Regions:
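Catalytic beta-strand/loop module used to bind and position nucleotide/cofactor moieties
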Residues: 30-37, 52-78
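Structural signal for conserved beta-strand scaffold positions within catalytic alpha/beta enzyme cores
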Residues: 18-20, 69-71, 109
Length: 141
């Protein structure tokens, strides 16, 4: 809730795009490549072509757009910080929706992260269709 409170002005004053990658895509191409694919999709979903894209970390997606990688960028650049918050709020809301379909996993509370409770639910119920089969906590469950 506190993350999403301050987003009103960001949504009004900034351009943003979302890049969604499914759990099946992550399983096929690995988490790093999936992150780069999500970034690429988000950039391509922008309503404008950016003059420069700031990227948190050392890796950048393969696009013909000027980019600058910044290690720890979410704590240095306001634009990266805002993008990180927007992405987290979007994902949290998505997990709340998934909780309605898969209540046994309590996604509303754990947001899909590997909590003890979440792993216990996987042990008891098995995985559901949104779990990443390549995640070490899910392997052999």
């Amino acid at each position: 809730k506190s993350r999403s409170r301050g987003l009103g002005d960001v949504y009004k004053r900034q351009y943003y795009g979302f890049g969604i990658v499914s759990n099946n895509e992550i399983d096929k191409i690995n988490i790093l490549n999936a992150s780069l694919l999500a970034m690429k999709r988000a950039i391509l979903n922008l309503p404008i072509k950016p003059a420069l894209v700031l990227v948190d970390g050392i890796y950048k997606p393969d696009l013909n757009i000027p980019m600058k990688t910044i290690i720890g960028g979410d704590s240095i650049e306001d634009a990266i910080s805002a993008a990180s918050i927007i992405a987290k709020v979007y994902r949290d809301n998505l997990m709340i929706e998934y909780n309605k379909k898969y209540p046994d996993y309590n996604f509303k509370k754990n947001k899909g992260y590997g909590t003890k409770e979440h792993f216990f639910a996987i042990q008891q119920k098995g995985i559901c269709t949104i779990h990443r089969k390549s995640f070490k906590g899910v392997l052999n469950k």
